[in-house]
Structures are given as C-alpha cells and as structure tokens.
C-alpha cells in the first residue's frame, strides 16, 4: 500500500499554558482509541474517506471520536475523526502512528497556521482581518477560524471539531491571548454531521462587531448580523486589485453583501457606485461601512435579475460591473442547474457593461471548477453578444491555502474581463 501523507512529521511542540492538564486527562484516550477498518484496498491521500469504503464497527464510536484507521489487511493508514452518521465517515488528521491527536497536536497545528500568516505571509502589515485556519488547507479538516481584530470567529464543519472544541479554544487563546470568541455551525452541517450547537460567544452575549482595516479601507465585521463568519476576507486581494481600475468610473456592485467591492471603489475614486443586494440586513451593514470611510454609495434592495433587465431596457450602463453571488449549491447533482443560474446572471450583467468596460465575476461554489466557470463565462458572452478579453483569473488570498490533493478547498473563482464591444 502506498504511503499516506496527511501531514509532515513534526518535532514535539511545547504545550501552551493551560493545555498540560488537558493532555494528561486525555492521554489514555489516544492509547485506547477505537480502530476502524476499511473494507477495500485504499491508496488515496485525500483526507476524506467516505462511508461506503468503511466497515461498520461492532461498537460505533460517537460522532467525531478520534479513531485509528487500518486497511483491509490491517495495515496502518492513519488517525482521524470518525462519524458513522455522515457521508464522510473519516476525516484523516495524522499519518504518523507515533503522534497522538490530542490537545498538544491541536496546539501545534493551529500554531503552525498562525505562523504561516504572520511570519511568511506577513498579513498583519496588510490587515487585522485574515483567515487563521482554513480547514483541509491547514490540515484541520472541518474547522474554519477567521480573525477580525480582537474577535475570533470559529466555524465548525465537522462533528470532530465540534467535539474537541475546548482544545481548539485553548490553542487559539495561546496564540491570541486577548481575543474574544464567537463560534457557530451552519444548520445544514449540524444535520449532516449529527450534532446540535447554538452560536456561543465568550462574552455571554451577542458579540460587538469588530472594526477591521485592509489596505487602508475600513469595515465592520459582524458575525451575528452578516453572512458566514461576518466578512469575506477571501476577497481582500481581489478588492484591492480591482479598486485600482475604477478611478473616475461608474461602478455597479451586484450581490454587494456588506459592500466590500463597492466601498473599495468609492475610496479609490470612482465617480459613482451603486450596490444591489436582496438582503436588507447586509445592506444596513454596507451603509455603515460606507459611512466608516466617509464615502457616498447608493445601495438598493432588489433581486438582481429584474433589476438588471430594467437597467438594460433603460439603457443604463456602467464602466465596471462586479458580480459576486452567494454559494449556489452544496450538492454535486445540482452543479448543472447552478451553472445555468451563473449563465443567466452573467449574461444579464454583461448587458449593462459599457463597451471597453470591465466585468469582475466570481463563484464561491466549490463544486464548480474553474474550467466550468470559464466555459460558462464564454457562453454568457456569446449569448449576450459581447466579446470578452480575460485580464486576470485568481481566487482566494494566500491565507486560504489549499492542498493539491484536495481540490475542494480551492472554492473561489475570480475572473476579471474587459468587454470589448
């Protein structure tokens, strides 16, 4: 069987203060963890192993339990989380049989993620808002942590991370001693992973929003009031790049959410900025973000489909159009309908771009590949009767790393086009 590589071997890490007792309390667990056997030969390196490949254990561990995994012939595979209720039965974490997955393991892995951002990427020089942990990209399948100044927002995508959340909190406190915490899990994830969890704040109340700065532009990050973790730091470099193309131009920000692209554009000297979103709550936050930066933006609550048709019929056109819709689907069987919706909205968006203008279009649907998205855009240009010159293709910032063997982690597609005619 081929060697399995879920993480690099490491030297023992020094325990953060407060974790020593947790390690002693849980030392026996990793000595006596249940063993899960695969039913077929397995030569993969992806950290997910699906239910159909796993023998059902006689005594099923609780969802999110740490287990040892062996092949059909008893050969060691690795150590990870087991969930007999989820489509993803195993989330592999550790390939070294000599390394326990315990509080010290989490402290080391989270510490490495923080050091990547601070010492290699040097993100503190750019912003006080960045992704601390990006799930599989940082070897922590099912965990996302975002930093917004003094507020850490923790999102659980697996029962295993939820079950071991105290280890996670302790490790984060070591790296960010003065941080506030807000943690939650999407209802769909809870149902899929078989656990129940209500949002929790370390202060015991709804957390106060954090004021963040990136590339000199200020925003309010509000995990309790906005979508996902409260702000989309993944678009930081895309916002910055596009903002240098907008001086003196009319800008339309579709699906504007809390105003990220639009606020950048206004700060960088756009002559006019219009933001459209169907969600009044996020528009209220967007107006606050414009006020934070002392810029004027016209925000409109509307469904972009009829709004764009009306704008095109009225001959309204913009120099720069941004289209950044929410995730379309979690289901592989719904990818084709999702692509059809992307096609329809991009075709309409192209109808309000001036000749020679720019279209910045995005997809955060991980199941839609970059190739599929570019093909959709080609067809949108054809049906709209517009010729597209692609200037730049990118994705999320470097604080959202992905493993080459886990393409699902590379979820964001960003395409910047010039509309030639």
Task: Show which residues each predicted segment covers.
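Conserved SAM-binding loop of SAM-dependent methyltransferases across substrates and taxa
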Residues: 258-271
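Conserved class I S-adenosyl-L-methionine
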Residues: 248-255
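S-adenosyl-L-methionine
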Residues: 281-319
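C-terminal catalytic and target-recognition region of SAM-dependent MTase-like enzymes
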Residues: 344, 358-421
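Non-catalytic accessory regions of SAM-dependent methyltransferases
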Residues: 6-8, 16, 22-149
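Conserved SAM-binding motif I beta-strand of class I
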Residues: 272-277
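Non-catalytic substrate-recognition/targeting regions of SAM-dependent transferases
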Residues: 133-146, 162-232, 240
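Mobile active-site "lid"/loop adjacent to the S-adenosyl-L-methionine
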Residues: 282, 318-348
């Amino acid at each position: 069987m081929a060697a399995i590589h879920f993480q690099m071997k490491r030297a023992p890490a020094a325990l953060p203060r407060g974790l020593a007792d947790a390690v002693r309390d849980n030392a026996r667990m990793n000595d006596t963890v249940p063993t899960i056997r695969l039913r077929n030969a397995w030569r993969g390196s992806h950290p997910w192993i699906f239910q159909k490949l796993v023998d059902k254990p006689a005594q099923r561990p609780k969802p999110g339990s740490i287990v040892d995994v062996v092949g059909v012939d008893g050969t060691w595979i690795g150590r990870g989380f087991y969930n007999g209720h989820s489509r993803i039965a195993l989330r592999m974490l550790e390939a070294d049989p000599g390394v326990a997955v315990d509080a010290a393991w989490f402290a080391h892995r989270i510490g490495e993620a923080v050091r990547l951002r601070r010492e290699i990427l040097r993100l503190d020089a750019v912003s006080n808002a960045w992704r601390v942990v990006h799930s599989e990209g940082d070897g922590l399948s099912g965990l996302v942590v975002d930093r917004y100044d003094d507020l850490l927002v923790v999102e659980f995508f697996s029962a295993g991370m939820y079950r071991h959340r105290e280890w996670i909190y302790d490790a984060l406190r070591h790296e960010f001693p003065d941080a506030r915490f807000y943690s939650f899990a999407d209802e769909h994830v809870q149902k899929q992973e078989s656990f129940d969890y209500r949002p929790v704040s370390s202060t015991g109340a709804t957390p106060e929003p954090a004021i963040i700065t990136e590339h000199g532009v200020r925003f309010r990050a509000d995990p309790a009031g906005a979508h996902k973790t409260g702000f989309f730091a993944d678009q930081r470099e895309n916002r910055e790049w596009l903002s240098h193309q907008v001086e003196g131009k009319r800008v339309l920000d579709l699906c504007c959410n809390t105003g990220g692209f639009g606020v950048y554009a206004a700060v960088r000297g756009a002559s006019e900025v219009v933001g459209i979103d169907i969600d009044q709550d996020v528009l209220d936050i967007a107006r606050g973000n414009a006020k934070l930066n002392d810029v004027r933006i016209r925000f409109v609550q509307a469904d972009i489909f009829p709004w764009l048709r009306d704008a095109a019929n009225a001959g309204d056109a913009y120099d720069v159009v941004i289209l950044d819709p929410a995730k379309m689907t979690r289901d592989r069987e719904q990818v084709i309908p999702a692509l059809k919706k992307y096609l329809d909205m991009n075709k309409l968006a192209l109808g309000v771009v001036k000749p020679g203008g720019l279209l910045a279009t995005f997809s955060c649907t991980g199941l839609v590949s970059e190739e599929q998205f570019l093909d959709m855009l080609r067809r949108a240009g054809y049906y709209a009767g517009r010729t597209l010159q692609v200037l730049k293709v990118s994705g999320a910032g470097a604080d959202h790393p992905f493993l080459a063997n886990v393409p699902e982690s590379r979820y964001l597609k960003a395409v910047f086009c010039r509309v030639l005619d």
